[in-house]
Amino acid sequence: MGGDFEHRWTQTRESILAMKELWTKPQAEFNGKYYNFPLVKSYPKPAQKPHPPVILGGHAKTVLERVVSWGDGWLPNSITPDKLAESRATLDRLAKDAGRNPSAISISVHGQPADRDLIRRFHDAGANRVIVRPTTMKTDAEMGIELTRIADAVIR
């Protein structure tokens, strides 16, 4: 897609910093390595204050440091509850060391099966939310049945 894979996180960080300028200031300008714009007005502003949450995904060694430095949450992939508990402890320590409130950094685990016990274990390990992915269905009626099955397994 034309991106610089080697520097994807550098570009991502810079784009997020540029967006935060646009989201939080009446007039903003940005001068970076990848993105530059003169003093501009950008409206409408996001409803969420100070800006929409920035959720970073992945499992790279430095992702938790990135989350603490310029994110608001983490979206890990292919993680177990035990590994999540370790990562939550690391994330909390890094946040405290950086002067951030650890509870202000969310963790969302995605793509999980409709397993009430597994979801409870993820919450106990420090996840703020667990996203259950329904099976692909061909019709709306089939999807309704699938969502009811998930609700029965997880919520009721």
PLM regions: where:
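Active-site-adjacent structural elements that line small-molecule/cofactor binding pockets in enzymes
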Residues: 1-156
